[in-house]
Amino acid sequence: MEWLDILESHGQALLGPTAWLVLWTIVKIVVIAVPIILCVAYLTYWERKMIGWMHVRLGPTRVGFRGLLQPFADVFKLLTKEVVVPTQANKILFVVAPVVTLMPALAAWAVVPFGPEVVLANVNAGLLYVMAITSIGVYGVIVAGWASNSKYAFLGALRASAQMVSYELAIGFVLVTVLLVSGSLNMSEIVLGQTRGWFAEHGLTFLSWNWLPLLPLFVIYVISAVAETNRHPFDVVEGESEIVAGHMVEYSGMAFALFFLGEYANMILLSCMASIMFLGGWTSPIDIAPLTWIPGWIWLGIKTFCVVSLFVWFRASFPRYRYDQIMRLGWKIFIPLTGVWLVVVAIWMQTPWNIWR
């Protein structure tokens, strides 16, 4: 982009290379982080509206036009509530835990490409970075349960950590398979790898995306992402009939809101990763003029919105699993299945019918 090059040259001349680099990095972080936080806020609104429609209700309607200001009312309510720290709790860890849960979900966006050159840090190990940084969130859950000094919070934290680690393995095997077929850990190159092939050459780009040849893995990824974020129907971590809110049971006010933000930020991140790994990222589904005029970040947003809506649909449609059923699904079905499919794809790539050349 020429105007960005002009801005960079003027900035370096005015402030010097080092100061400009620091300032420009902060600007890029703000430009990415603020919309993500707004998306998290309005995802709560969309969830309540969608579930309301499925229940033949209206959902939020009172605050602003058609309830569009409801997220801001919720934030104001949580900001004005007192953060009560239990007497016997470890106060420092009690406060740190919500931050540890939220920050990895925001830091992972540093390597997410919104377009061919629109990325904060276009590193060659981007996929590895996302897998590593998102695994840190489980520590926030464990610390919250332990620091609360409550048997219910600790039981919820144990459930959450075991469930998150279990389904991280399944997601890891799926992403390793995508790495295998794309031949790169760079997320921009993974997207570009889905724009090649016979279908892409004939304008049917959506048939060259990874979702078609790796359809079973795509399904496993979406279900594992729901379990990874402790969302319904895998939300036994906060089973209201047993342990109330799980590891968050002792939290209130803005500390509770940070856990809430972390959960929804992870939903958006994993949905965006599904769009990049399987749905062609910023590319248009059909390579014809009206569709190719739409900016890539809008296509990525549409695909992410469709995937994240599946999370909401699952919540409104399915009953909660028992904890032993969840662990059995992860360890006895998903992990072996993804391992077998990884071997199948590796063998497939050695045959004359390799479609990823």
UniProtKB/Swiss-Prot annotation:
- The UniProt record lists the keyword Membrane: yes
Cell compartment(s), UniProt: Cell inner membrane
Q: Name one GO molecular function term.
A: oxidoreductase activity, acting on NAD(P)H, quinone or similar compound as acceptor
Topology versus the membrane: Multi-pass membrane protein
EC number(s): the record gives 7.1.1.-
Coiled-coil regions in this chain? none
Please provide the record's keywords in A-Z order: Cell inner membrane, Cell membrane, Membrane, NAD, Quinone, Translocase, Transmembrane, Transmembrane helix, Ubiquinone
Instruction: List the GO biological process terms.
Output: aerobic respiration
Q: Where are the transmembrane segments?
A: 20-40, 92-112, 127-147, 165-185, 206-226, 254-274, 294-314, 329-349
Enzyme's top EC category: translocase
Q: Matching InterPro entries, A to Z?
A: NADH_UbQ_OxRdtase_su1/FPO, NADH_UbQ_OxRdtase_su1_CS
Please report a single Pfam family linked to this protein: NADHdh
Among PROSITE patterns, the record links this protein to: COMPLEX1_ND1_2
PANTHER family, per database record: NADH DEHYDROGENASE SUBUNIT 1, NADH-UBIQUINONE OXIDOREDUCTASE CHAIN 1
Functionally, this protein is described as follows: NDH-1 shuttles electrons from NADH, via FMN and iron-sulfur (Fe-S) centers, to quinones in the respiratory chain. The immediate electron acceptor for the enzyme in this species is believed to be ubiquinone. Couples the redox reaction to proton translocation (for every two electrons transferred, four hydrogen ions are translocated across the cytoplasmic membrane), and thus conserves the redox energy in a proton gradient. This subunit may bind ubiquinone.
Give the protein family.
Belongs to the complex I subunit 1 family.
Could you give the subunit structure recorded for this chain?
NDH-1 is composed of 14 different subunits. Subunits NuoA, H, J, K, L, M, N constitute the membrane sector of the complex.
Q: What is this protein called?
A: NADH-quinone oxidoreductase subunit H
- According to its UniProt entry, this protein's organism is Bordetella petrii (strain ATCC BAA-461 / DSM 12804 / CCUG 43448)
Q: Which gene encodes it?
A: nuoH
